[in-house]
Amino acid sequence: MLLLFDVGNTHTTVALTRDGKMFEKYRISTKKYETEDELYVFLKSLYGGTVIEGIATVVSSVVPSLNIVFEYFANKYGDGNVYFVSSTDYNKIVWNINYPKELGADRVCDVIAAYKEYGKDCIIIDYGTAITIDVLKDGVYEGGVIMPGFAMMINALFKGTAKLPLVEVKPYDGFIGKDTESNIRIGTINATVGAIKYVVENITKEYNTPPVIIHTGGHALYVQKIVDGVVDRDLTLRGMYYFYEEKKNSAC
């Protein structure tokens, strides 16, 4: 049994896994916990104390300040082992970028799982606080793209202006808005989907054979209707499991 934490800027996904199969998955606010005891109490309310005690912890985090919380948690309530995902600790893939250590752990997990399950040629689009596009070509990670996420753009308009409202993160059916809300949704959601389609189409030209396009993250379903590909909501979590398996086997 493993306890997985996918720590994002806004939300944390926590899941239990046995032999790579995910179950009892929850999405909580990243601001919900600031100490190992707060984290334990919160998890106990979800899983029960005996379930989460004495097992290994795997963490994919883009919030480095919380790493110490997971270290203390693993030592106090787990088996003392916490595995932090990093590209520099996974050598089954060549990371052909300038600074591999800077690559976000969530993106590392996405690439690992895509390589394991979909093959050597993949474009992975992850819709979180930021939208990331990652390029796997011939089994080599070639780099990618970072864009503002849907909610981030909507919040920027709301906070940066005096009169624009905070609108729902939802695509608009059309490209000419008749009111302020539809104008904002077109200018943020629809326009970003168009940008993603443009970027993916141009990246695809770099391949000799069509790559597998994978959508993951909270708003993946919005874009799949416009940018062809498969939706895989648990891609990051399974990448964490594969990372753990590699680390465990290399330590044997």
Curated annotation (Swiss-Prot):
Pathway: Cofactor biosynthesis; coenzyme A biosynthesis; CoA from (R)-pantothenate: step 1/5. It catalyses: (R)-pantothenate + ATP = (R)-4'-phosphopantothenate + ADP + H(+). GO terms for biological process: coenzyme A biosynthetic process. Gene3D superfamilies: 3.30.420.40. GO terms for molecular function: ATP binding; metal ion binding; pantothenate kinase activity. ATP binds at residues 6-13, 129. GO terms for cellular component: cytoplasm. A monovalent cation. Ammonium or potassium. Its cofactor is NH4(+); K(+). The keyword ATP-binding applies. Its EC number is 2.7.1.33. It is found in: Cytoplasm. Catalyzes the phosphorylation of pantothenate (Pan), the first step in CoA biosynthesis. Homodimer. This is Type III pantothenate kinase. It comes from Fervidobacterium nodosum (strain ATCC 35602 / DSM 5306 / Rt17-B1).
